[in-house]
């Protein structure tokens, strides 16, 4: 069995119809993991892995953006939060760090979302 523990939580005032691209969120890192932030402010962009805590079920076929006028696609061809393992991944801009708190822009997660991992975006990730 696999055990995954949150390293922190998202704090924001996001509603269902928010423009996540412009939303500034706080990621509050738990005390046991703060040392893992060492030199993170040298990164411009981060990839945030999180748990869709508001999802409770999934389908293997979905309509993109929950729009029934769009043709169905497989869940792995979509950004749907209703996935078999309820994991999300978003690239964000790191605005600043204050102790155990990261200020990021563009995170498509709601208040209270558990953060599972953080990775820097590297040149390798930007290859076409």
Where do the model's predicted regions map?
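Glycine-rich, low-complexity intrinsically disordered segments
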Residues: 1-91, 95-128
């Amino acid at each position: 069995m696999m055990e995954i523990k949150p390293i922190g939580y998202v704090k924001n005032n996001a509603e269902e119809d928010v423009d996540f691209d412009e939303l500034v969120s706080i990621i509050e890192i738990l005390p046991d993991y703060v040392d893992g932030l060492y030199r993170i402010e040298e990164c411009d962009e981060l990839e945030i892995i999180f748990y869709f805590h508001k999802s409770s079920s999934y389908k293997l076929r979905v309509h993109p953006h929950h729009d029934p006028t769009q043709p169905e696609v497989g869940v792995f061809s979509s950004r749907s939060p209703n996935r078999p393992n309820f994991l999300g991944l978003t690239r964000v801009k790191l605005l600043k760090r204050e102790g155990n708190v990261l200020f990021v822009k563009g995170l498509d997660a709601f208040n209270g979302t558990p953060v599972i991992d953080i990775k820097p975006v590297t040149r390798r990730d930007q290859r076409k």
